[in-house]
Amino acid sequence: MTEIAGSSDVVERGLVTYSNEAKRELLGVAAETLAAHGAVSEATAREMAAGALRASRADLAVAITGVAGPGGGSAEKPVGLVHFACAGPGDRLVAIERRYGEIGRGAVRLASVVQALEMLAAAAKA
């Protein structure tokens, strides 16, 4: 997202929170949410986006949590499962789920970035 010159005009910060500890400490994801739903869940994505918005001076925040692969999947949460959430002003919060399948780690990551940018664009127009 920051490869384009001038991106600092619209990107205030980015957080990478792979561990549950980072999700709790940096984004305020509740330990109860992680215990009940796991890191890869709609509930966690929603709390991540809301926490990112609170932790910044931004108008919008997007969160992604998923299983890019090649390992780490399960029957319930297979490789390619990704949850997204976009938070905006006035408690506006939209979440979606995508199941990309086993298309390769790089392809899952790229598709996830595209989806996140589409969510941000839609939220900016709303």
List PLM regions with ranges.
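Short alpha-helical segments enriched in small residues
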Residues: 2-126
